[in-house]
Amino acid sequence: MQYRHEWKHEISVFDVLCLRIAGGGITVNSCSEGIESPEIFIEDGDITVTSTDDGINACGTETADGSLPGVTINGGTVTLLNPSGRDADGIDSNGNIDINGGLVYISLVGDGSNCALDYGSENGGVCRINGGTVVACGGSTMLETMSETSAQPSLLYAGATQAAGTEIALQDTDDKTLLTFAAPNSFSAVLVSCPEMQLGSTYTLTLGAISQEITLTQVADSYGVSGGTGQGGSPGLPQKGLTPPIDSDFLSLL
């Protein structure tokens, strides 16, 4: 697709087999499901989806060649917003999610069981970040960390609910800002990743007026509430489907 258009519909961009977006602009102002197909490839373009259900959904049980459904983002800018939905996801795949490049910003209201990135781990699916910049904000009820087979480190924080408009920033030890995003909706979990992040390095994660230094110890790192361990994460995160407490102060969690 190499055009700009605006939609207001139940499912805004759909293909029964495979959908590839190669450039241009797509703006979905209001919908239930945003972009839906068993296979979705985003190569380039400027895409903004405001939905009440999933922003991007790799649906079904298998693709035309019999493999798992999947979402692959190789470039472009993808912004997924959900200010009012419940049990909704930013990117939802019944199989895999692969982010290899581009800019991906997700902001779902942080109550209910809204999950910024939801993949089919129960079906053998994986969620890999191999490149690009990702800031994915949502609820903390259905958390999944990224897969350890990711080539690029990521950090998942879950804890106290942060207000709409809270600015998220990540800085290195030289005070260089690596990423920043002002989340339009409240959130209780955020995942960040960018090409500059390296294992063993220390970063400062800032949420509004509070901040904490964190040293990355594994590819899919996580900090937050006490509980079980999510897929690929450090101890201290809840398992998918469990509800963590959200009344702790951020600084006391880390």
Regions found by a protein language model. Give the residues of each.
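A composition-driven surface/loop motif
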Residues: 1-254
